Regions:
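Generic recognition of long tandem-repeat/solenoid scaffolds
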Residues: 108-109, 149-151
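N-terminal Rossmann-like FAD-binding beta1-loop-alpha1 element of flavoenzymes
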Residues: 9-36
């Protein structure tokens, strides 16, 4: 096990998957100094295989159609989708230089059909925001003191 010297950060995100990278981005927009710790050798590793390697970004249907298509109680998704909806996802990628397309079933993919372009866009946005990412940095334990994570 390797002990990393971790710089001070207001926010530390564990994992550089899609959710981790977007959480880091959101925190950076709030002015936080953000550090991502990723155990793998590259960010977004699992994104490479989504959508058969093409990365299905979202669905372009209206939110009510999306909720209705969820077999079991779509209400659990209300708060997250009303906060950052599918249109916001598309706008985020377009604004950051990723061309997208909508296919059958309103599925949204990168125009290139390469998930690597999605990852590249996310990584570039994080760098632009000053987010630091440490690869090969597996988190195995959290140290708490007075109800706060201190290490």
């Amino acid at each position: 096990m390797r002990n990393w010297r971790i710089p001070m950060a207001n926010v530390i995100v564990i994992g550089a998957g899609a959710a981790g990278m977007m959480a880091a981005y959101a925190a950076s927009l709030c002015g936080h100094q953000v550090l991502i710790l990723e155990k793998n050798e590259k960010a977004g590793k699992k994104i490479y295989i989504t959508g058969k390697g093409r990365c299905n970004l979202t669905n372009a249907s209206d939110l009510e159609t999306i909720f209705a298509s969820i077999v079991h109680n779509g209400k659990f998704m209300y708060s997250s989708l009303y906060t950052f909806d599918n249109q916001a996802v598309m706008d985020f990628f377009i604004t950051n230089g990723l061309e997208i397309k909508t296919e059958r079933g309103n599925r949204v993919f990168p125009q290139s059909d390469h998930s690597s372009d999605v990852i590249r866009t996310l990584v570039q946005v994080l760098k632009k925001q000053g987010v630091e990412t440490r690869l090969h940095a597996e988190v195995t334990d959290l140290v708490q003191k007075d109800g706060k994570i201190t290490g």
